[in-house]
Amino acid sequence: MGYKMKRITMTVFFSMIGILLAQGTPTIMRCSYMKVNKGKEAAFEKAVTSHVSRWHGIGQWNQYGWVVETGSRTGQYFVGTLGHYWEDFDERITTKEHDNDWKRISNAYVDDDNGGSGLTFWNYAPELSYNNSASSKIAFTTYHCRANALDSMLEIMVRFKEANEKAMIDVSYLVFKKEAGGPNEVFAVLALMDGYADMAPMSPSIMERYVAAFGMEVWQKDYQTWTNGLKWSETEIMSFLPDLSSTSPE
């Protein structure tokens, strides 16, 4: 959560939070990882670009793509759709041509052993998220909580947002709560970045912001709650792929 974020004016990149907030209450994101056969990445990207341009344009079902640059899934693709109501997934109507094309892409390019990366559903939490910027990269951090610790940690995220607001810190991040697809005691912080330079430590630090907003006693109490509640966390850096993504509405 201590990444330095800078706003950018490059409109070619997708502003995720703009999509989410523009649609008001639809907050559900569905996503998965795709492990492409080695040497087939360029062909896969070309095929997905064609697929998205035909079936996932403005006014159609949105689809966005990133490529993972760090961790055990380096080189895999992160593909998702967001800004939905739950019932949208029941009511969506696809064509046989669309479904066959996506099946063709999967059969031709995706590794049969796809790393167990099944579909997951996440619920965007605007009350925990902070700021709004477009981004060419994201730092996707998942926090896996111990039993009965999730609510307490999300309460800390509320105060963390307030501390950032009081400090007027120049960061941008979205918070999602996991709803389905594996263990549910999980939330994610999706930090919006320009590049790796935004991973550098910030001033004031998280502790300094928190203490300034709530005092040392609250910081120490919440730090202990966070430490006790966190089972483990993992951060993946991803680059946005505009050609593999729906065009954002103005």
Where are these regions (language model features)?
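Hydrophobic h-region of N-terminal signal peptides that target proteins for export
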Residues: 14-22
